[in-house]
Amino acid sequence: MKANLLVLLCALAAADADTICIGYHANNSTDTVDTVLEKNVTVTHSVNLLEDSHNGKLCRLKGIAPLQLGKCNIAGWLLGNPECDPLLPVRSWSYIVETPNSENGICYPGDFIDYEELREQLSSVSSFERFEIFPKESSWPNHNTNGVTAACSHEGKSSFYRNLLWLTEKEGSYPKLKNSYVNKKGKEVLVLWGIHHPPNSKEQQNLYQNENAYVSVVTSNYNRRFTPEIAERPKVRDQAGRMNYYWTLLKPGDTIIFEANGNLIAPMYAFALSRGFGSGIITSNASMHECNTKCQTPLGAINSSLPYQNIHPVTIGECPKYVRSAKLRMVTGLRNIPSIQSRGLFGAIAGFIEGGWTGMIDGWYGYHHQNEQGSGYAADQKSTQNAINGITNKVNTVIEKMNIQFTAVGKEFNKLEKRMENLNKKVDDGFLDIWTYNAELLVLLENERTLDFHDSNVKNLYEKVKSQLKNNAKEIGNGCFEFYHKCDNECMESVRNGTYDYPKYSEESKLNREKVDGVKLESMGIYQILAIYSTVASSLVLLVSLGAISFWMCSNGSLQCRICI
């Protein structure tokens, strides 16, 4: 009875003891992140680094409208296909939009030489000046400048390219021509021309009066001599002849010289180019809307400051880097493991606290105390703020380093460069895989470091309290300490702010600690006596029982007993 009473008193004393616990914040967040060692770790706070949404629209880029080619393509626009007349007034744009199935390109059949390279050059042009390089009325007085064809009809009538002149015989003669232009524009000038290849000698004679014609085009770094290739060909757009189209970029101060005695499709208009790093060409079926953006893709505009996107690899403007990842989320908070009430209030970050506190809302790490005056939470503002500053700086640094926004336009290859195109795709895929791997690895490593950082902070807070209390309190697990003395709210605050007065409470703690130890010792002594008594009594009962059984068996003859002297 005495032992039971002492044990009960000890239990009551423990139940009334003041306690303080170290813990961390938890909330109802369902955000999950991946680390090097774990997947789908639920955390209290995180930031998304991957943009996966767009508005499905073509928008102005930094306030400047794009050039929509509509049913025309680059070739039809630059040569001046009559069906592209609405594009003639255009002088500037933010980017150029082609549709996948544009109908109006070159109208007279033939090849546009180095067309893909020209598109690449135009991808960095944001405006141009269209000007008469060789005026129609004065440049070719001895030749007919009104050549037209049904292949380039407009409104039901034969016509021709708006930027070129088809020079033919005049009054039965095609005298040798020579004309030049000096670039005084102070910028590169794009010059286009063509060479006509008739289907037979009769047409050659009728148009140019010369069966041995040639065309010569010369600049300081371009020198070509062309001769017509007269041959029967299958009809395209009802034409058995062909025209090949050529271009060159004339540098400032340079001169271009045209010399011919037939078959020249002469330039009438040229373009003084102004380069712009934010321009580009995209192929898209999206429609134009009244909106503004800093980043345009063929699928739609992206308005985001995130460093990565998985929407489209082709982008115009200040755009996130394209990666193939489906998720890139960086942790900024803690593991989110709310404490389970059936286990008690306190429970483990860093392996010694089983769960976080949803009741602590003003910090990441802190305390929960319980004494005669009640109980409550208090965040440790200093460690929380230091952690927030460190993680915020880290996230900003990561985003700043990876947020290299730029234009990524597709490369152009003609049908004869299929192997080069395939090789380029493999190279691009390789770079894309590297970018994706680097982005994912960076996030995994930083998430691991952040969660370890939080674990370390909680441990440090625990050790800070432990070093103050020393033997004035005992560790009871789950990040908690039980005081050997009364600790009111003022005392609790001193523990939290690091000013706990150990000597002040050491005498009271010593007495209470000795009482508790004495109760344990006395209880242990009584239990030992009871154990010995129980063992002896059990042995005596066993011996008496064995003797009774032996006497009974002897009396009925089942057991013979012989006593020898």
Curated annotation (Swiss-Prot):
<keyword id="KW-0732">Signal</keyword>
<dbReference type="GO" id="GO:0039654">
    <property type="term" value="P:fusion of virus membrane with host endosome membrane"/>
</dbReference>
<feature type="disulfide bond">
    <location>
        <begin position="59"/>
        <end position="291"/>
    </location>
</feature>
<keyword id="KW-0564">Palmitate</keyword>
<keyword id="KW-1167">Clathrin- and caveolin-independent endocytosis of virus by host</keyword>
<feature type="glycosylation site" description="N-linked (GlcNAc...) asparagine; by host">
    <location>
        <position position="303"/>
    </location>
</feature>
<feature type="glycosylation site" description="N-linked (GlcNAc...) asparagine; by host">
    <location>
        <position position="28"/>
    </location>
</feature>
<feature type="transmembrane region" description="Helical">
    <location>
        <begin position="529"/>
        <end position="549"/>
    </location>
</feature>
<feature type="disulfide bond">
    <location>
        <begin position="107"/>
        <end position="152"/>
    </location>
</feature>
<keyword id="KW-1170">Fusion of virus membrane with host endosomal membrane</keyword>
<keyword id="KW-1162">Viral penetration into host cytoplasm</keyword>
<feature type="signal peptide">
    <location>
        <begin position="1"/>
        <end position="17"/>
    </location>
</feature>
<comment type="similarity">
    <text>Belongs to the influenza viruses hemagglutinin family.</text>
</comment>
<feature type="disulfide bond">
    <location>
        <begin position="487"/>
        <end position="491"/>
    </location>
</feature>
<keyword id="KW-1168">Fusion of virus membrane with host membrane</keyword>
<keyword id="KW-1133">Transmembrane helix</keyword>
<feature type="lipid moiety-binding region" description="S-palmitoyl cysteine; by host">
    <location>
        <position position="554"/>
    </location>
</feature>
<dbReference type="GO" id="GO:0046761">
    <property type="term" value="P:viral budding from plasma membrane"/>
</dbReference>
<feature type="topological domain" description="Cytoplasmic">
    <location>
        <begin position="550"/>
        <end position="565"/>
    </location>
</feature>
<feature type="glycosylation site" description="N-linked (GlcNAc...) asparagine; by host">
    <location>
        <position position="27"/>
    </location>
</feature>
<feature type="disulfide bond">
    <location>
        <begin position="295"/>
        <end position="319"/>
    </location>
</feature>
<feature type="glycosylation site" description="N-linked (GlcNAc...) asparagine; by host">
    <location>
        <position position="497"/>
    </location>
</feature>
<feature type="disulfide bond" description="Interchain (between HA1 and HA2 chains)">
    <location>
        <begin position="21"/>
        <end position="480"/>
    </location>
</feature>
<keyword id="KW-0946">Virion</keyword>
<dbReference type="GO" id="GO:0019064">
    <property type="term" value="P:fusion of virus membrane with host plasma membrane"/>
</dbReference>
<keyword id="KW-0449">Lipoprotein</keyword>
<dbReference type="InterPro" id="IPR013828">
    <property type="entry name" value="Hemagglutn_HA1_a/b_dom_sf"/>
</dbReference>
<feature type="site" description="Cleavage; by host">
    <location>
        <begin position="343"/>
        <end position="344"/>
    </location>
</feature>
<feature type="lipid moiety-binding region" description="S-palmitoyl cysteine; by host">
    <location>
        <position position="561"/>
    </location>
</feature>
<dbReference type="Pfam" id="PF00509">
    <property type="entry name" value="Hemagglutinin"/>
</dbReference>
<feature type="glycosylation site" description="N-linked (GlcNAc...) asparagine; by host">
    <location>
        <position position="285"/>
    </location>
</feature>
<dbReference type="GO" id="GO:0005886">
    <property type="term" value="C:plasma membrane"/>
</dbReference>
<dbReference type="GO" id="GO:0020002">
    <property type="term" value="C:host cell plasma membrane"/>
</dbReference>
<keyword id="KW-0348">Hemagglutinin</keyword>
<feature type="topological domain" description="Extracellular">
    <location>
        <begin position="18"/>
        <end position="528"/>
    </location>
</feature>
<comment type="subunit">
    <text>Homotrimer of disulfide-linked HA1-HA2. Interacts with human CACNA1C.</text>
</comment>
<feature type="disulfide bond">
    <location>
        <begin position="72"/>
        <end position="84"/>
    </location>
</feature>
<protein>
    <recommendedName>
        <fullName>Hemagglutinin</fullName>
    </recommendedName>
</protein>
<feature type="lipid moiety-binding region" description="S-palmitoyl cysteine; by host">
    <location>
        <position position="564"/>
    </location>
</feature>
<keyword id="KW-1160">Virus entry into host cell</keyword>
<comment type="function">
    <text>Binds to sialic acid-containing receptors on the cell surface, bringing about the attachment of the virus particle to the cell. This attachment induces virion internalization either through clathrin-dependent endocytosis or through clathrin- and caveolin-independent pathway. Plays a major role in the determination of host range restriction and virulence. Class I viral fusion protein. Responsible for penetration of the virus into the cell cytoplasm by mediating the fusion of the membrane of the endocytosed virus particle with the endosomal membrane.</text>
</comment>
<keyword id="KW-1165">Clathrin-mediated endocytosis of virus by host</keyword>
